[in-house]
Design a protein with these regions (language model features):
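Nucleotidyltransferase catalytic core that binds NTPs
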Residues: 1-158
Length: 158
C-alpha cells in the first residue's frame, strides 16, 4: 500500500505526476488531504480557494477522469504524517522532492512504534514556463495556470 498527500487546493500537473507515480507504485493508495485547520497552520496555505469537502470532490473527479477506477482511499490529514505513522500496511510514501525529507521522520516514528520502515519515492517538482515551481500558491495568485503556463508578468517600474 502506498501513501501520498497534500493540500490539493488548486489541482495542477504536479499533483497529477504525484498521483501517477503513486498509482504506478502501489495496488492501493491512501491519499491524505490536509484538513482546513491543518492547512491554515501551514505556511503559504492560509488562503485556500476550496474547503476540505470541495478539495476532496475535485480530487476524486480528477482521479476518475485521469485514472478511471483505481483502488484508493482518502484520509483527512490533521498533521504532517497522517496514516503513515499509524497504519502498518503502508509500504511506501510517494512525495514531492520538496517534502520527501519527511520520510525519514516518518520512519523514525514507525521504528519507535515497532513498525517496519517504508520506502520513500520522490517525484520531482515540475517547473512552470518561467522555471519556477508549479504550485497551488502560484495558481491562486494568478501567476500561472494548472499546466505551468505564465498568466501574468510583473514589470519593474523605473
Amino acid at each position: 500500500m502506498v501513501a501520498t498527500g497534500g493540500t490539493f487546493d488548486e489541482l495542477h500537473i504536479g499533483h497529477l505526476a504525484l498521483l501517477t507515480k503513486a498509482f504506478e507504485f502501489g495496488d492501493k493508495v491512501i491519499i491524505g488531504i490536509s484538513s482546513d485547520e491543518f492547512a491554515s497552520r501551514v505556511k503559504n496555505k492560509k488562503i485556500l480557494r476550496h474547503n476540505y469537502e470541495e478539495r476532496v470532490k475535485n480530487l476524486r473527479d480528477m482521479i476518475e477522469k485521469r485514472f478511471g477506477h483505481v483502488n484508493y482511499t482518502i484520509a483527512k490529514l490533521d498533521n504532517e504524517f497522517g496514516p503513515t505513522v499509524t497504519y502498518g500496511l503502508v509500504d511506501a510514501l510517494v512525495a514531492s522532492s520538496e517534502t520527501a525529507c519527511k520520510g525519514e521522520e516518518i520512519n523514525d516514528i514507525r521504528r519507535t512504534n515497532r513498525m517496519k520502515p517504508i520506502s520513500i519515492v520522490a517525484v520531482d517538482i515540475l517547473k512552470a514556463e518561467d522555471g519556477g515551481p508549479i504550485s497551488s500558491t502560484r495558481i491562486r495568485s494568478g501567476e500561472i495556470d494548472a499546466s505551468g503556463k505564465i498568466l501574468s508578468r510583473t514589470t519593474k517600474s523605473e
